[in-house]
């Protein structure tokens, strides 16, 4: 798990070693305080118990974790709460971040934002400026800053992502499914109506040219080009109207602006 290729959004302990206990996230409560998403600190101090076996307190439930044969690992799993506790400094260029749901994450030390991968959490943790920490001490989480933007529920996959635009009626690309949707329904509705209006006007103009210039077109065949242009523009506008009418809409969940 210390390799550089580890997905930064995934929990540090895989599901294959989760045992019989499944960690659950507490219900999400919107807190106006910046400490609502402050990851709890930890101290990677290994102390032997009375029998000489190295142990450490779990940073979530404070239970003792046996470190016998695990000192080569960066994190260990608590058998009581099933959460991860770090016992070593993170790899170079990385840092630990603990989500308020107690999921321990690893990310680049320059990261400003990280998302929790647990399906029942899906929080987006905003980290403050990077702080330099000596290698002798475990990395401490940076203070989260108040984000600007909107939590948006994707109209395709239903996942929540942070949209940094401070206005609605824009197109957004979901980072989960990579599909484009409209943030709010006003933009596609307005553009659909506009394209329908322009398309019908072009078709009516084409019909008028066809009826009014039939005799003229028999002598000057270039008149047929104007008919084709009018009908083609009308068809293109109607196709665009169908696109905007069928586009998926993503709705904002909470606004931080």
From Swiss-Prot:
Where in or outside the cell it occurs: the entry states:
Late endosome membrane; Lysosome membrane; Cytoplasmic vesicle, Phagosome membrane; Cell membrane
Q: TM spans, by residue? A: 192-212, 227-247
Gene Ontology cellular-component terms for this entry are: late endosome membrane; lysosomal membrane; phagocytic vesicle membrane; plasma membrane
Reply yes or no: does the keyword Acyltransferase apply: no
State the membrane topology.
Answer: Multi-pass membrane protein
Q: EC number(s)?
A: 3.1.3.78
Q: Which UniProt keywords apply?
A: Cell membrane, Cytoplasmic vesicle, Endosome, Hydrolase, Lipid metabolism, Lysosome, Membrane, Phosphoprotein, Transmembrane, Transmembrane helix
Which residues are annotated as modified residue Phosphothreonine in the UniProt record?
A: 22
Name its GO BP terms in alphabetical order.
negative regulation of phagocytosis; phosphatidylinositol dephosphorylation
Compositionally biased, Basic and acidic residues: which spans? 1-10
Pfam families per the UniProt record, alphabetical: Tmemb_55A
- Reaction it catalyzes: a 1,2-diacyl-sn-glycero-3-phospho-(1D-myo-inositol-4,5-bisphosphate) + H2O = a 1,2-diacyl-sn-glycero-3-phospho-(1D-myo-inositol-5-phosphate) + phosphate
One GO MF term on file is: phosphatidylinositol-4,5-bisphosphate 4-phosphatase activity
Q: Where is this region: Disordered?
A: 1-34
Which superkingdom is the protein from? Eukaryota
Show the PANTHER family listed in the entry: PHOSPHATIDYLINOSITOL-4,5-BISPHOSPHATE 4-PHOSPHATASE, TYPE 2 PHOSPHATIDYLINOSITOL 4,5-BISPHOSPHATE 4-PHOSPHATASE
Q: Report the function annotation for this chain.
A: Catalyzes the hydrolysis of phosphatidylinositol-4,5-bisphosphate (PtdIns-4,5-P2) to phosphatidylinositol-4-phosphate (PtdIns-4-P). Does not hydrolyze phosphatidylinositol 3,4,5-trisphosphate, phosphatidylinositol 3,4-bisphosphate, inositol 3,5-bisphosphate, inositol 3,4-bisphosphate, phosphatidylinositol 5-monophosphate, phosphatidylinositol 4-monophosphate and phosphatidylinositol 3-monophosphate. Negatively regulates the phagocytosis of large particles by reducing phagosomal phosphatidylinositol 4,5-bisphosphate accumulation during cup formation.
- Name of the protein in question: Type 2 phosphatidylinositol 4,5-bisphosphate 4-phosphatase
């Amino acid at each position: 798990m210390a390799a550089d290729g580890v997905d930064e959004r995934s929990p540090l302990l895989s599901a294959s070693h989760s045992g019989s206990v499944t960690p659950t996230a507490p219900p999400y409560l919107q807190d106006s305080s910046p400490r609502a998403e402050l990851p709890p600190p930890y101290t990677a101090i290994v102390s032997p118990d009375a029998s000489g076996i190295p142990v450490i307190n779990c940073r979530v439930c404070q239970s003792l974790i046996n470190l016998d044969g695990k000192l080569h690992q960066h994190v260990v799993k608590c058998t009581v709460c099933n959460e991860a506790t770090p016992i070593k400094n993170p790899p170079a260029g990385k840092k630990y971040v603990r989500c308020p749901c107690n999921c321990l994450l690893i990310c680049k030390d320059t990261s400003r934002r990280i998302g929790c991968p647990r399906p029942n959490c899906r929080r987006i943790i905003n980290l403050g400026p990077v702080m330099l920490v000596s290698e002798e001490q475990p990395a401490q989480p940076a203070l989260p800053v108040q984000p600007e933007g909107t939590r948006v529920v994707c109209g395709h996959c239903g996942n929540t992502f942070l949209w940094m635009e401070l206005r609605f009626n824009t197109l957004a690309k979901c980072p989960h499914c990579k599909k484009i949707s409209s943030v709010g329904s006003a933009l596609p509705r307005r553009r659909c109506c506009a394209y329908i209006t322009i398309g019908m006007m072009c078709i009516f103009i084409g019909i008028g040219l066809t009826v009014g210039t039939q005799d003229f077109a028999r002598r000057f065949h270039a008149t047929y080009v104007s008919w084709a242009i009018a009908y083609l523009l009308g068809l293109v506008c109607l196709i665009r109207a169908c696109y905007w009418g069928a586009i998926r809409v993503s709705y904002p969940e909470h606004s931080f602006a």
